[in-house]
Amino acid sequence: MRRSKRFEVLAQRPVNQDGLIGEWPEEGLIAMESPYDPASSVKVENGRIVELDGKSRAEFDMIDRFIADYAINVPEAERAMQLDALEIARMLVDIHVSREEIIAITTAITPAKRLEVMAQMNVVEMMMALQKMRARRTPSNQCHVTNLKDNPVQIAADAAEAGIRGFSEQETTVGIARYAPFNALALLVGSQCGAPGVLTQCSVEEATELELGMRGLTSYAETVSVYGTESVFTDGDDTPWSKAFLASAYASRGLKMRYTSGTGSEALMGYSESKSMLYLESRCIFITKGAGVQGLQNGAVSCIGMTGAVPSGIRAVLAENLIASMLDLEVASANDQTFSHSDIRRTARTLMQMLPGTDFIFSGYSAVPNYDNMFAGSNFDAEDFDDYNILQRDLMVDGGLRPVTEEETIAIRNKAARAIQAVFRELGLPLISDEEVDAATYAHGSKDMPARNVVEDLAAVEEMMKRNITGLDIVGALSSSGFEDIASNILNMLRQRVTGDYLQTSAILDRQFDVVSAVNDINDYQGPGTGYRISAERWAEIKNIAGVVQPGSIE
């Protein structure tokens, strides 16, 4: 067949490199409204749920039992379930119905009922609802700070830059598992150099991650995963109860804690039980609520390639963020793994959360070039900073970031690199050369960094852990090296571990180390003139884009 020239051009477009698949309900490859999803139902006897979404208590699997016993407001359940799904959907977008009124209903309905509510809503209505249902009034952002070589100097410099760019949380992980303590240490020092009060985590194997937190090298955890079918749980030798125990281990030691889930995970692992991705995710969100965990990272997360490949998949991602907020949970709304070759698709996917605002719009944005992102690449990376800042300016939307100058960025990267150099020297760790400090000051990514002696580093990591190095040792090393401000910031982060105030729902810290959470900054949106509004000071910051032609400069 003779080819159309237009179709030849279209075939070369980036979007046509994306993988898309038709709906296959039997294998769970359907975003919402699978013919195999259960109809919603609930029955309460003697204060106990004895029927849930078409199953009697005798038929419950362990997830049903956990949800029925711990996650639903039982006294209100039968009354709330009598409301029509369309009526609840309309309440979600009605500015005359408060968030508080809706929470009383949405914490008392079942996972299947939530699906029926979401089925009534288009993405604009979901965004309207999310703007109202977000737990914390003020939106914010989280980033990834990693690199291919696990270079601690580069991590410190990138973390400092991410701090001045406005990220409230920063997350790292490793290429080599044994590097975790160095990465956590570098992230802590760099982030507190960039901005006081940034929360940090190192996503690794749970025992190591918990130990790093207990030593004061990290301040939160989020990669404790939960799933929507029993088979996926047991495949990992887990149950909702074991996950709840792990969550309490973090929180009881003063570490902020959220779970992670996301549409598509069960289908990806081959245990979907023919249910839709959103129904199974709804169960995950209820598990989170039942475990007493304050928040959830969801939005397909690392399974976005699966969810984004099926029809209405990106709509389902927005719906799962909304469902989590309807359970009065903190929402870290993903946008954290690349899923499309198309700049148009990846931007549209992000606008679903950026426009209404979530507790963390990204979880996280890659603060490094994606070739250095050890979480498999983010939807936006360091090369998109200017685009993102101009989007905020174009739309007058607070996406949690701020423009920075080249001069201040170079200065803060240099300070962070010198600070981590001093810490390594004071703690007797492998020396960081002036060449490394200079390279990190000006680097874009690991391609611009000299190699370190990995064998020597890993031996030092092991020795550091045997010596029981803690956050207080870091404070002492910085103080004795003249970095009093960073030392003070880290000491204040350690104090937060004692007070525990930042364990509140949706908590972040401002630059004075005051907690900003759903307790003291509760979202009170009820239409125009209410809820979060960009202040004059913040708007001036957003507008301050480098290269803007100022009227006074025109001759």
Curated annotation (Swiss-Prot):
It catalyses: glycerol = 3-hydroxypropanal + H2O. It is an enzyme of class 4 (lyase). Keywords: Cobalamin, Cobalt, Glycerol metabolism, Lyase. It comes from the Bacteria. It holds the Pfam family Dehydratase_LU. The keyword Cytoplasm does not apply. The keyword Lyase applies. Its cofactor is adenosylcob(III)alamin. Its EC number is 4.2.1.30. GO terms for molecular function: cobalamin binding; glycerol dehydratase activity. GO terms for biological process: glycerol metabolic process. Belongs to the diol/glycerol dehydratase large subunit family. Probably consists of three subunits: large, medium, and small. This is Glycerol dehydratase large subunit. It comes from Citrobacter freundii. The gene is dhaB.
